Amino acid sequence: MLPKRRRVRAGSPHSAVASSTPPSVVRFPDVAIYLAEPRMGRSRRAFLTRLARSKGFRVLDAYSSKVTHVVMEGTSAKEAICWQKNMDALPTGCPQPALLDISWFTESMAAGQPVPEEGRHHLEVAEPRKEPPVSASMPAYACQRPSPLTHHNTLLSEALETLAEAAGFEANEGRLLSFSRAASVLKSLPCPVASLSQLHGLPYFGEHSTRVIQELLEHGTCEEVKQVRCSERYQTMKLFTQVFGVGVKTANRWYQEGLRTLDELREQPQRLTQQQKAGLQYYQDLSTPVRRADAEALQQLIEAAVRQTLPGATVTLTGGFRRGKLQGHDVDFLITHPEEGQEVGLLPKVMSCLQSQGLVLYHQYHRSHLADSAHNLRQRSSTMDAFERSFCILGLPQPQQAALAGALPPCPTWKAVRVDLVVTPSSQFPFALLGWTGSQFFERELRRFSRQEKGLWLNSHGLFDPEQKRVFHATSEEDVFRLLGLKYLPPEQRNA
């Protein structure tokens, strides 16, 4: 329970202090916001006031003739008009402030500036508010709805993704899926969630996820999420799993054995695989986001090596960069040749070419297991493919900066970058491209839809009908969507 606040009398020295909290810089002097408290609540009003002021908005503590925008939450047009009539009358000739729904405020905060007022924002006219689609128009599967890279509910989705990640660290598949699916729905909504009523009818919003969102809407933070992010368990598991070659099971074993830092791992090299040793050796570089420019530079290097080895072969950038991301933690490439069979044995030659240039810091080669392609298609339970591939750490050349006299020494001439090279036959390329583009959750949902709604098995090798023993053929990603009866979503809309 919040402590009772002492009533401050008008004109007292304390009243001046209480109302003197606006920030030093007001970026939008023509906009003066008053947050009406009745349905909003005192703590939420205080939070929203701090948020707006931190972004340069002018928020007034008292209703007066200076107010240009009154913002209300969970209030009908009729209630808003009654509220305004009950307030002290403004001086003659003063314009009435706009009565606006909280959605105008949240959209303005997201934009970093006042957004244009639309009819849906105004409370003066009793029109039905436009809210995000509910279950009738919000498909249950992430592969049925667009998920843009930039969406309207980042704060909310990231909180649920934190809880999903923590559940994954505990091998709690049920909680992981519940939070992941709810977060994915938020990414597909066409506008910000400003009130809990907007979640009604949306798929995958159970009691727990709804409670988290409610706390975030009311207080701007969620105690459970905060505790998870600050916990030693979560931070250690996150640290260990960011090391190349370390999965959840290994990280958990190390945690149970009392290990907490990377230095402790380095002191016990006997417990590390070669891949993990390389991950620790180049950890500083590998934990630094890879820029799109770096990914494109790597593509040029790999394309040159591939052309030298097999003219006519193509190299395609996949993963998050294909979905529109400007940075990532690794770079994935698919290599193929239009004449099926020409790609066999290509990767070792490409790696040899890269090694001769001194670009390979580490690589682990996996030969192809495509001898029985029909068998690979029937592996419905496996998300791993059988393509020829190499998990690498490449040294990407960096422009050398000359050191000035007395300055720090020049920067390193290369940067370690995680790279996956995958070789696929041309007949399986559309499925491989779809699978390696992601996102991981989008692909999981696509396989679930194929299995549960169509009775088909989908993986990076192809699409298979287990009843009719039939293998489907496709020449593009669009073909795969069409075979599944789905509307095609471009890569930029697959950030589920």
Curated annotation (Swiss-Prot):
GO biological process: B cell differentiation; DNA recombination; DNA repair; somatic hypermutation of immunoglobulin genes
Gene3D superfamilies found in the cross-reference section: 5' to 3' exonuclease, C-terminal subdomain, Beta Polymerase, domain 2, BRCT domain, DNA polymerase beta, N-terminal domain-like, DNA polymerase, thumb domain
Entry's EC annotation: 2.7.7.7
Keyword Transcription: no
Location in the cell: Nucleus
Protein name (database record): DNA-directed DNA/RNA polymerase mu
Organism encoding this protein: Mus musculus
Keywords: DNA damage, DNA recombination, DNA repair, DNA-directed DNA polymerase, Magnesium, Metal-binding, Nucleotidyltransferase, Nucleus, Phosphoprotein, Transferase
Bias type Low complexity, positions: 12-22
